[in-house]
Amino acid sequence: MSVRPQNDFDGKAFAAQLSTAPGVYRMYAGDDTLLYVGKAGALRKRVGSYFNGTPKNARLTSMLSQVARMDVTVTRSEAEALLLENQLIKSLSPRYNVSLRDDKSYPYVLLTREQWPRIALHRGPRAVQGRYFGPYTGVTGVRETLSLMHKLFKLRSCEDSVFRNRSRPCLQYQIGRCSGPCVDLVAAPDYAESVRRATMFLEGKSDQLGEEIMHSMQQASEALEFERAARLRDLLSSLRSMQNRQYVDGRAADLDVLACATQSSQACVLLLSFRDGRNLGTRSFFPKTNGEDSADEILGAFVSQYYAEHSPPREILLDREIPEAELIEAALSTAAEHKVALKWNVRGERAGYLLLATRNAQLTLVTELTSQSAQHARSEALRELLGLAEPVKRVECFDISHTMGEATVASCVVFDASGPVRGQYRRFNISGITPGDDYAAMRQAIERRFRRAVEENGVIPDVLLIDGGAGQLAQAQAALADLGVENVLLVGVAKGEERRAGHEALIMADGRELRPGAASPALQFIQQVRDEAHRFAITGHRGRRQKARMTSKLEDIPGIGPRRRASLLKHFGGLVGLKAAGEAEIARVEGVNAALAARIYANLHGLALPDAAGEASPQ
């Protein structure tokens, strides 16, 4: 239900006509900006509490002074209200709620759900059907897990496009890291059994898995199936070896440890994870707060929101008691379909884990605040150097990368006073220009970036850095003028003498040059932004160039048309398989004779190409 008042919002009257059922309430400002999302065991009582008496702190006073209307959603239980509250906070990011930064970049192990499941590293939205295990503290942890999984269970890692088109096993099969389901070298029931065991391992049930494998090995031995018994023995040996390397403490088999540190209106929540006795490392989160949230409120919000997106372990240690712990515990247990216990008064080893997490949270927050302080100082120095009246809130920098005109890519990176805003980085694949024309590439990138901003009333930077001299700066100026973009300070960043860092010249739109010197905090900030733009452009360029070269390898060979190219790639399961084949193997592909096979082999290995005379027409 919703009420939009004609005049000032009457919170008491609104609360009086609400149900006493549990639910979620939302507060909106006059311009429909969402201010706050909350949950209630009894809507009438909870909403009414905001408007009875004086707000208990400045944050509430500020928030309530802006409320123009409220919405409520009735739920069946308070636990259901808690889940809905977390979903809304995650998707809508209300101004006054404690909210987590997006964690889509954290890596997971993905086990796909299909006839022949694939196991692989995964980042980003969960668009692929399957089970996601994690998140891990970094890519290294995922790769170590995947390497172990391939050795133990021999599950495929190839993409479906490669899997469907192979005609012979790949290198992974040859080195004993895949069972070869692509060419029917493993029976479906056996592969399914490997998937089941891999799932048990990822669920932290390696002890149970070891007992099961030992039992199967004994059965195989009794049945005189000695080859199968030997395979199971090797599997068990590898599993035991892994457990001995990674075992930490059997009593911390499946456990998360959370600690919250606060300082200067900022907070850090540190997560230390153990799975099957293995220390998976730590991750730090910096929730958005309003300066007056207490550490227990911040930690409580973190627990609710984080485990709404990630599978909780059976035991979660907290460095302090959190509000509504019993309710959160019940909601997590219901969602996870197993008992989840929240604990804060612990002894022995677990107290040691909490102490470790607490110290790390405090150190991480101090490091973050120090970094932010230095970043703010550099941003302020930039404002003074450029003569701006207002603080610099947003800086963008463009750079161009290519190899002799090939695969040209432009990058746009974004910084604010706190540092890089990586979620707003953009790359532009440049096309339709003379190869190697950096001026045209810069103009195209600027036009594409700011045309969208003009059409959609998007955000415009305070300062726009152009990596290059007067020529690139002039192109950016012309592009912005054509689009009618104003109030952007353009600065060209030209290489210094002998291209030495610290000797850069800053070229202003009016032709002035500034040379702040290597000791200038403002120049250090510009160098940081410029170097990040350079890195981001090069990474994009290399990826585009590699993709183009892989695609064009066969296209450049006389006698290879679309049909033959498709036949070759299908026969060998891709360019990698084709490159590993000899001339005789290539010549067995339908439509490829010995002469053409020799040309293909020579092209792929950088050898002198045989004469193409007498070849059939491309197909």
UniProtKB/Swiss-Prot annotation:
A GO molecular-function descriptor: DNA binding
Annotated GIY-YIG domain residues: 20-98
Pfam families attached to this UniProt entry: GIY-YIG (PF01541), HHH_5 (PF14520), UVR (PF02151), UvrC_RNaseH (PF22920), UvrC_RNaseH_dom (PF08459)
Keywords, sorted A to Z: Cytoplasm, DNA damage, DNA excision, DNA repair, Excision nuclease, SOS response
Residue intervals of the UVR domain: 207-242
One Gene Ontology cellular component: cytoplasm
CDD domains attached to this UniProt entry: GIY-YIG_UvrC_Cho
Broad class of where this protein is predominantly found: cytoplasm
Subunit relationships: Interacts with UvrB in an incision complex.
Protein name in UniProt: UvrABC system protein C
Gene that produces this protein: uvrC
